[in-house]
Each structure stands twice: as C-alpha cells, then as structure tokens.
Amino acid sequence: SKHSKPSKHSKHSKPSKHSKPSKHSKPEKCGSAMKRTEAAKCARKNGRFNSKRCTCTSVGKPSKPSKHSKPSKHSKPSKHSKPSKHSKPSKHSKPSKHSKPEKCGSAMKRTEAAKCARKNGRFNSKRCTCTSVGKPSKPSKHSKPSKHSKPSKHSKPSKHSKPSKHSKPEKCGSAMKRTEAAKCARKNGRFNSKRSTCNSVGKPSKPSKH
C-alpha cells in the first residue's frame, strides 16, 4: 500500500564504522597499485615511503597518508628524494660574476686563457685566475686577438695591464709572434721575430713600460 511504512530497522540502518575507511585511516593491506600511488605521492612530498606499512614518512616526522593530501610547494628535499623545483642550486652550478670558480674545465680554461692573453696577464690554470701584470703572459694556443674583445668579468685590469704600443714582450711564443706581427702590419711597421718587436718605418721603437 501507499501508506506502508518501512520497518524501524530500515530507517535506522547505518553502515558500520569499519565499512568505509576514513580519509586519514591507514590501509592495513596495501596492494601493488596502492603502493605505486602512495609512493608517487610520497615522492612529491619528498618523504620516505615504507612499503611494508604503506606509509609515507616526512623528513623528521611520520605522516599519515591521505587521499587528498597535496604536496606543498616549499617542502624541503630530503637526501634520498628527488630535488624539487625550489631547491637551491649548488655553489658550483653557475658561478656569479665576481666569484672565482673552484673547478675549471678545459673549455673554461681556454676561454679564460684567451681573455687573459688579450690583457697580457698571467693565467693560473690551477686556480683558473688571470693576474694582470705589466709583463706579458705566455700565450695560449687558442688565443685570438680581436678588436672588440671585452675584458673578462673575473679580473680587474690594473693600470699596467694594457701594454703600450711600443712595449717589448720578454718572452715571445709562436702565437704571440703572429699576434704582434698582425698588429705591426696594421701600423705598417717592420716586425722583428727574434726580438719580437715592431719597428716603425724609419725609426726603431723604444720600449716603454707604460
């Protein structure tokens, strides 16, 4: 009939407390699919995943895995987790403009040596530094003089770093000879390969330190 009322037990029949696990309950049994899901969530939070207990332990404190837990953006990475986007780069990743790189690769050495040769400084391959001195440095194989060469950011040129037009280099290698000969040719002078000097037409040049 229309007015038939359901039994008392039908209205008040509520599911038992243990039928549906709450959001924060720990799953007693954790399958392979559940483990992969929880492990992925735990990795995002940079925590440690315990496959036996199927729990995610954050750095320092164990956390209860929840279905709706979202990893925070500013979570600190643990030693064994993948580095997050906000992890600070290491000291050696990108050297700043004024910092001296501790480790200097072969490509870096060639670049710095070329810059140092242009300024007639001394290049220290161990420390990867260019010391500006009045005396010319030993030229590197890859140093090519350019008209628009800019001094490197790591070294501060001193007053005596740039030799005058008529200065005599004490040691003149094959690369330095080519460089000096090219400069001398631009001035329409005569280049002496033995003394590595450029004599202007008619008068020999006098060396000056400044």
Curated annotation (Swiss-Prot):
Keyword set, alphabetical order: Repeat, Secreted
Highest taxon above the source species: Eukaryota
Name of encoding gene: BR2
Renumbered residue ranges of the record's region Disordered: 1-210
Compositional bias ranges of the Basic residues kind: 1-24, 42-51, 64-98, 116-125, 138-166, 184-193
Broad class of where this protein is predominantly found: secreted
Region entry 2 X 3 AA tandem repeats of S-K-[HP], spans: 205-210
Tissue-level expression: Salivary gland.
Biased composition (Basic and acidic residues): 25-41, 99-115, 167-183
Localization, UniProt: Secreted
Stretch list, region 13 X 3 AA tandem repeats of S-K-[HP]: 63-101
Residue segments, region 11 X 3 AA tandem repeats of S-K-[HP]: 137-169
9 X 3 AA tandem repeats of S-K-[HP], as annotated region: 1-27
Sequence repeats: 1-3, 4-6, 7-9, 10-12, 13-15, 16-18, 19-21, 22-24, 25-27, 63-65, 66-68, 69-71, 72-74, 75-77, 78-80, 81-83, 84-86, 87-89, 90-92, 93-95, 96-98, 99-101, 137-139, 140-142, 143-145, 146-148, 149-151, 152-154, 155-157, 158-160, 161-163, 164-166, 167-169, 205-207, 208-210
Keyword presence, Transmembrane: no
GO CC annotations, alphabetized: extracellular region
Name of the molecule in the record: Balbiani ring protein 2
Its biological purpose: Used by the larvae to construct a supramolecular structure, the larval tube.
